[in-house]
């Protein structure tokens, strides 16, 4: 229907004014598609809106999951979705009924909406699918759109199943210390060997190229938008396994064909919008889990994470909900090399160490005298090592790539099969480790003053905690606070508080020369200058080295050079700044018993000029996956502290 130009008759301005009021009313009710609905079946639209209201569809769990509504403190709801283009009603972020009515109205329109510029039926296919299930749309009165772009996208997956992928933590990247999760779409025509060609569904913050330390701050407060994307799995494997040297765990989810379809439909919808990315709360693990909820809304997964979300905890939530099936590990390139080297004879290991430094030793008579199968195994392991170090890219990786070409050329001349070596990650299955939060209840003495204490840690793991499921020799403690009640004068106080305490011990050997490091920010009480329990602010950083032996079971020796600043009313000028060092040992005595010894000396040259000698002895005995016993002794000048505690992880 077209418009033709003509001269207005005297009575027509009034009609035009009434028409204008009607248009304004419709736009106010359904801002994006009300006009388009005029050309459709308005009576049928009203009927659908009425039926949806009678059935209370806007209150249904499924609708709230699709719109990402969460309860507010005032008794209402608000969507976690932060892109206005995700909503068809102006008040859709906080009004489920208005958004449902606007969505139904949008389905009658062919207007292109959202960042993807599609009709509402195609931009929000999961909403259309669910509302059609509830209201049984009459295709003659509400014709379905073909949605060719979605159909092509969906068909390319040829989806059979969904796997949750968990790359283990990476200590040298703040955004990856706790691990990461994303989904892999397993195709019907893929085998376990070819699933590396599958596509993944990933959620991540969109960062500027020069984010640096800025990311750690802005990421905490949601200053970056987070987007969903689909990326080939082999690129993610290259990033995590080959470059970052992180073991990858693959959890096949027990989802039906219908649940897989729902998950992919909602993923398509989220390509239209963004969420504000919060490092501790609404992070990758949280929003990836929301896709699983969309697949099966009856399972309340996100309710378990009201404040913060740690990736491995979402894996545990899936397991406890019965959604985890087969579990497969994909060891890192570093793990592959270390396991192969450990299986070598002393002679093979010596040739491996020579070849990775100087491939021309391939021509040495000693190497040529080895049996062909041994030569092949040494060459393959050397190639794995060189590939690991060439993965960094650019000029830094060029020398390793040149060496690897010589190694591969020599291997191609040997017509023997590869030696089969079982490769298991050094880290046990992450979801089978202890809980990420911990509470300690104990008692002890400080300078002959008895006390009872309780210690609560929000996350994550320290050097003495049971190691299965966690990165060996790594400590990440977040929001740790200890309270004590001293019998003397019945005094209760905060003994220690630490928002962040990180230690990364990286044992050096012929394969790795990564430095160890640590950082600690917090408060602890000190006995100094006549003040028995003065609050003392601490900022400590250190860098050093570690080495590993196996004299008994396993021992790690470490040494740090460090700098420290203190602030307390106990000090002259209320502060002191200095430096020094720490040496120590961390030992696995048995599978259940761990021991730690350390000694420190610091000289404070600024502020309150003083020396500080410290000793620490700690021991932990594991009772079960989530229970342990611990004893600790801390000594500083004129200050001795002993505590016995029972630890519960959750």
Regions found by a protein language model. Give the residues of each.
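Transmembrane beta-strands of outer-membrane beta-barrel pores
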Residues: 443-449, 460-462, 480-489, 501-505, ...
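Low-complexity, highly charged intrinsically disordered N-terminal segments
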Residues: 76-158
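Outer-membrane beta-barrel "beta-signal"
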Residues: 456, 620, 639-650
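Transmembrane beta-strands of outer-membrane beta-barrel proteins
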Residues: 437-441, 477-479, 513-521, 555-563, ...
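Active-site nucleophile-His-acid catalytic modules used for acyl/amide transfer and hydrolysis
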Residues: 233-308, 568, 633
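Repeated loop/turn-to-beta-strand initiation elements of outer-membrane beta-barrel proteins
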Residues: 462-469, 504-512, 550-558, 587-597, ...
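Outer-membrane beta-barrel initiation region
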Residues: 150, 281, 285, 329-473
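Glycine-rich catalytic cores of cysteine/serine-nucleophile enzymes that process amide/ester linkages
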Residues: 158-243, 456, 485-493, 589, ...
């Amino acid at each position: 229907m077209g418009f033709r130009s003509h001269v207005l008759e005297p009575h027509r301005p009034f009609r035009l004014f009434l028409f204008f009021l009607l248009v304004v009313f419709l736009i106010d009710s359904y801002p994006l598609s009300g006009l388009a609905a005029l050309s459709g079946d308005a009576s049928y639209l009203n009927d659908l809106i009425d039926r949806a209201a009678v059935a209370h569809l806007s209150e249904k769990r499924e609708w709230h999951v699709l719109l990402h509504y969460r309860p507010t403190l005032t008794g209402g709801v608000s969507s976690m979705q932060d892109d206005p283009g995700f909503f068809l009603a102006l008040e859709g972020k906080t009004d489920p009924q208005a958004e449902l009515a606007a969505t139904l109205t949008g389905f009658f329109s062919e207007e292109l909406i959202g960042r993807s510029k599609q009709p509402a039926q195609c931009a929000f296919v999961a909403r259309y699918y669910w509302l059609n299930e509830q209201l049984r749309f009459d295709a003659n009165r509400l014709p379905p759109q073909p949605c060719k772009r979605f159909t092509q996208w969906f068909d390319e997956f040829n989806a059979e199943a969904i796997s949750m992928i968990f790359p283990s933590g990476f200590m040298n990247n703040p955004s990856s210390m706790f691990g990461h999760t994303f989904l892999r779409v397993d195709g019907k025509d893929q085998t376990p060997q070819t699933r590396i060609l599958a596509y993944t569904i990933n959620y991540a913050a969109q960062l500027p190229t020069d984010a640096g330390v800025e990311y750690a701050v802005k990421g905490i407060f949601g200053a970056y938008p987070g987007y969903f994307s689909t990326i080939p799995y082999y690129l993610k494997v290259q990033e995590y396994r080959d470059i970052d040297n992180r073991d990858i765990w693959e959890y096949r989810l027990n989802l039906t064909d219908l649940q897989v379809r729902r998950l992919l439909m909602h993923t398509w919808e989220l390509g239209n919008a963004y969420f504000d990315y919060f490092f501790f709360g609404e992070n990758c693990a949280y929003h990836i889990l929301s896709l699983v909820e969309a697949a099966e809304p009856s399972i309340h997964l996100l309710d378990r994470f009201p404040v913060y979300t740690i990736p491995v905890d979402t894996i545990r939530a899936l397991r406890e909900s019965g959604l985890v099936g087969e579990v497969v590990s994909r060891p890192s390139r570093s793990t592959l090399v270390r396991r192969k080297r450990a299986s070598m004879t002393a002679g093979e290991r010596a040739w491996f160490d020579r070849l990775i430094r100087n491939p021309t030793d391939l021509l040495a008579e000693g190497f040529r005298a080895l049996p062909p199968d041994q030569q092949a195994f040494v060459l393959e392991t050397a190639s794995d090592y060189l590939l690991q170090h060439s993965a960094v890219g650019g000029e830094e990786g060029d020398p390793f790539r040149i060496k690897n070409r010589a190694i591969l050329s020599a291997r191609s001349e040997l017509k023997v099969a590869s030696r089969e070596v079982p490769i298991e990650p050094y880290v046990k299955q992450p979801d089978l480790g202890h809980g990420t939060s911990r509470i300690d209840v104990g008692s002890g003495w400080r300078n002959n003053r008895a006390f009872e204490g309780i210690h609560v840690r929000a996350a994550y793991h320290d050097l003495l905690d049971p190691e299965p499921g966690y990165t060996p020799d790594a400590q990440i403690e977040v929001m740790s606070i200890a309270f004590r009640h001293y019998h003397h004068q019945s005094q209760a106080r905060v003994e220690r508080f630490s928002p962040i305490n990180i230690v990364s011990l990286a044992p050096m050997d012929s394969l790795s020369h990564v430095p160890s490091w640590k950082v600690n920010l917090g408060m602890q009480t000190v006995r100094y200058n006549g003040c028995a329990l003065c609050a003392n602010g601490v900022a400590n950083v250190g860098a050093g080295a570690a080495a590993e032996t196996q004299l008994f079971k396993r021992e790690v020796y470490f040494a740090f050079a460090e700098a420290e600043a203190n602030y307390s009313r106990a000090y002259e000028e209320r502060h002191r700044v200095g430096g020094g060092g720490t040496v120590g040992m961390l030992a696995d005595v048995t599978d259940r018993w761990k021991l730690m010894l350390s000694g420190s000396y610091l000289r404070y040259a600024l502020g309150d000029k003083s020396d500080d000698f410290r000793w620490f002895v700690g021991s932990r005995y594991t009772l079960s996956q989530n229970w342990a016993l611990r004893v600790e002794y801390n000594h500083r000048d004129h200050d001795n502290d002993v505590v016995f505690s029972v630890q519960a992880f959750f």
